[in-house]
Amino acid sequence: MEGVAPLKKRTQRAINANRRRLLREAYERYPEYACCDPEEFNWHEAEARLNVFDLYYLADSGYLDVTRGSAGVHRTPDFYMLTPQGADLIEIPGLLAERLPLRKREREERKS
């Protein structure tokens, strides 16, 4: 796709850290929508594209509700808000570590 920044390779830790950040920002603003700054959420810069990718991943997983704008052929987010499933992920002890672990040990502790 012309004009679209490639997705750069990330570690699972980096992916989960960014997704946790987005969830926490939504949690802090609930029940209001968080605004998607076009400089932070766009298809043309590598870091901003990662934010778009992670935001839609969380939305498709049921943790965030995203209002979608239109930018030609690309889904572009305008606002996002935490869903009840997203709140559970933050509030239920151990659930965030199970779903989006930052360390291998977090997942192992949850299993035992």
Spans of model-derived segments:
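Clustered cysteine/histidine zinc-coordinating segments, centered on FYVE zinc fingers that bind PI3P
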Residues: 1-7, 53, 68, 104
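Short alpha-helical segments that sit at the start of domains
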Residues: 2-29
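Generic structural signal for hydrophobic core residues of well-folded globular domains
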Residues: 26, 30, 90-93
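Short acidic, hydrophobic short linear motifs in intrinsically disordered regions
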Residues: 31-46
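Short amphipathic alpha-helical interaction segments
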Residues: 44-66, 77
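Short loop/turn motifs at secondary-structure junctions and domain boundaries
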Residues: 71-72
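Short, amphipathic alpha-helical interaction segments positioned at domain boundaries
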Residues: 77-111
